[in-house]
Swiss-Prot record:
Keywords: ATP-binding, Cytoplasm, Decarboxylase, Gluconeogenesis, Lyase, Manganese, Metal-binding, Nucleotide-binding. It catalyses: oxaloacetate + ATP = phosphoenolpyruvate + ADP + CO2. GO terms for cellular component: cytosol. It comes from the Bacteria. ATP binds at residues 201, 220, 236-244, 285, 321, 440-441, 446. This is Phosphoenolpyruvate carboxykinase (ATP). Its EC number is 4.1.1.49. GO terms for molecular function: ATP binding; metal ion binding; phosphoenolpyruvate carboxykinase (ATP) activity. Coiled coil: none annotated.
Length: 530
């Protein structure tokens, strides 16, 4: 099969110009399509609920980057960033375009990624499903008008065909599912999965390649700003509390998941929020709950015949989600950018129950923990994970970072130094014992610790260095029991704590070996007990 760029462009143009390709539909128009096509149901909250079928999380083993001459030397190839050759990609790409050409209806959205005008990525999103198009409209940055959208000449195109199933033997994939990113052809090709999060994380992966090439830090974090203009960043993997902790009624939200940090400060990459919805309640998370209204999408929640939503029901997945435009939250920064950060919070959900609830890191420790990215995989964010497992995810988001980790770590270290940023490690996981024995650290206490940190009250507080990890733990924090600040005190069996802690330290050391000599200086100064 012979393919070329001309044919590819012609096919895309043909799809866009089809009479039944619906361009830049309003939320109401998309709602009508979703309901008419039986793609979702209307809930009493006003949001639509859609099912993603058997794929209720990302499929990281089915994600590939096309190995192309101008880009291949920059990508950190391995289990996460898997290569696929250009010819294989193009054959599959054209099969998908031909498949979409035969569909009765398609949905097209044009918008942006990145709220910084200098590095903004112009996007076209072509969807097989109406609810996926509403997802794109909610999650990416929306043009001011349909007229503006018509003038967008995309830097990148998402082609999403969830009902197209690949044949691994013929198409060179690992399963029926595929997420393929080509920097040369400027396309993200998605098929075989209805999980809408693949679109947003695909563009995030693209930005994580493009921004550092311009000496701009890209980050898997949430961000907010206080009344005095003080900015806080929250790093962490899905389920560690980024969205929850940054949705603070006393601080304005910059964004909940993906950001850049350039010479002017911090900017949001997205135009929406993608919050975990399991066990969501108005009492615990009022901002998120109130954002789930007309225009929002719920994924895989259980909806009764009367339209009521049971957020506690996990029969389909633990990874239930809500996708809504950022302006569904009242106190946001417009546009979604702010000054340089004063405080960085690294969030981890420690299933061992030995990491302190909060500790202050020096720059070397910050680099070490950023590269380590320790947390526990929480149920539902990836297929096959049903209970927490300890894991290391470089940069607190390894699945989304195509360049070598030291590229991001070096940028972060330079920025911490340049702007005198305070960095804290916060454990939102377990205390008093490992998962199954101990208990989850109270969200109330975590909020109190985080609030004290970002207010600057912990900057010059009294600290004690714990004997196990060598971390600096605050001696006291207002309205937080002293007994939980040093984790050994929360364990009834101190010897079991020491055994568990030593096991974790060894896991950190073993994990860090993969970085080799490039990061020896960070390991020497930043690792535990240094």
């Amino acid at each position: 099969m012979s393919v070329d760029t001309y044919t590819e462009t012609t096919k895309i143009d043909k799809l866009l110009k089809k009479p039944t390709s619906h361009f830049q539909l309003s939320t109401t128009q998309l709602y009508n399509k979703i309901l008419d096509n039986n793609e979702g149901v209307l809930t009493e909250l006003g949001a639509v609920n859609a099912s993603t079928g058997k794929y209720t999380g990302r499929s990281p083993k089915d994600k590939f980057f096309v190995s192309e001459p101008s880009y291949r030397d920059n990508i950190d190839w391995g289990e996460i960033n898997q290569p696929i050759d250009e010819e294989t990609f193009l054959k599959l790409y054209h099969k998908v375009l031909d498949y979409l050409d035969k569909k009765d209806e398609l949905y097209v959205f044009k918008g942006y990624a990145g709220s910084d005008k200098d590095t903004m990525l112009k996007l076209t999103v072509i969807n097989e499903l109406a609810w996926h198009n509403l997802f794109a409209k909610n999650m990416f940055i929306r043009p001011e008008s349909k007229e503006e959208a018509t003038k967008i000449k995309p830097n990148f195109t998402i082609v999403s065909a969830p009902h197209f199933k690949a044949d691994p033997e013929v198409d060179g994939t690992k399963s029926e599912t595929f997420v393929i990113i080509s920097f040369k052809h400027k396309v993200i090709l998605i098929g075989g999965t209805e999980y809408a999060g693949e679109m947003k994380k695909g563009i995030f992966s693209v930005m994580n390649y493009l921004l550092p090439m311009q000496d701009i830090m890209s980050m898997h974090c949430s961000a907010n700003v206080g009344e005095k203009g003080d900015v806080a960043l929250f790093f962490g993997l899905s389920g560690t509390g980024k969205t929850t902790l940054s949705a603070d009624p006393h601080r304005k939200l910059i964004g909940d998941d993906e950001h850049g940090w350039n010479k002017n400060g911090v900017f949001n990459i997205e135009g929406g929020c993608y919050a975990k919805a399991i066990n969501l309640s108005k009492e615990k998370e009022p901002q998120i709950f109130d954002a789930i209204k007309y225009g929002a999408i719920l994924e895989n929640t259980v909806v009764a015949e009367d339209g009521s939503v049971d957020f506690e029901d996990n029969r389909y997945t633990e990874n239930t989600r809500a996708a809504y435009p950022i302006n569904h939250i009242d106190n946001i920064v417009v546009p979604s950018k702010a000054a340089h950060p004063n405080t960085i919070i690294f969030l981890t959900a420690d299933a061992f129950g030995v990491i302190p609830p909060i500790s202050k890191l020096n720059k070397d420790q910050a680099m070490y923990h950023f590269l380590s990215g320790f947390t526990s995989k929480l149920a539902g964010t990836e297929r096959g994970v049903t209970e927490p497992e300890p894991s290391f995810s470089t940069c607190f988001g390894a699945p989304f970072f195509p360049l070598h980790p030291t590229v991001y770590a070096d940028l972060l270290g330079e920025l911490i130094d340049l702007h005198d940023v305070d960095v804290y490690l916060v454990n939102t996981g377990w205390t008093g014992g490992k998962y199954g024995v101990g208990r989850r650290i109270s969200l109330h206490y975590t909020r109190q610790m985080v609030n004290q940190a970002i207010s600057g009250k912990l900057k010059n507080a009294e600290y004690t260095k714990d004997s196990t990890f060598g971390l600096s733990i605050p001696v006291e924090i207002e309205d937080v029991p002293k007994t939980i600040l040093n984790p050994i005190n929360a364990w009834s069996d101190k010897e079991k704590y020491k055994t568990q802690a030593e096991d974790l330290i060894q896991r950190f050391e073993k994990n860090f070996e993969k970085f080799g000599e490039k990061v020896e200086h960070i390991a020497e100064k930043g690792s535990f007990n240094k």
